[in-house]
Amino acid sequence: MKITIEELPELRIAYFRNVGEYGGKQNKELMESFKKWAQLNGVFHNSVILGIPQDDPSITPKEECRYDVGVVLNEDFNVLQPAQVGKLPGGKYAVFLLDHTKEAVSEFWGNIFSEIEKNSLTMRGEPIIERYTSQMIDNHLCEVLVPIQ
């Protein structure tokens, strides 16, 4: 698996949140609702969409797992409801490019910790981020950003 390292600044985001089991139809519906909001508010075109699982499902009960879908915004953008405003911490990330299929994503999550260890990296205690651009979506790809030290 190919890894690139990227340094990100702290990012301001607008996001929608779902609470419940990861990977279900609710997260897909959340993404579709968020895209509609982003289009109506003029922040969808040429944007970077983020999927952010906030909790570790091996620790947090599945019905309490939080999943955010968001878009990066500049500081002066006025975020309208029902979106919320948040910050993503800056720092160093290991970036993995994946086929955006259920099988590839499932395989990634099954191998992530061994890949991090194999590459002598140490994870930070921040959420892992899924990143999508329109070009990636058109090519059935996504990136997963793993926070590292």
UniProtKB/Swiss-Prot annotation:
SMART domains: AraC_E_bind. It holds the Pfam family GyrI-like. InterPro entries: AraC_E-bd, DNA_gyrase_inhibitor, GyrI-like, Reg_factor_effector_dom_sf. Gene3D superfamilies: Regulatory factor, effector binding domain (3.20.80.10). This is SPbeta prophage-derived putative transcriptional regulator YosT.
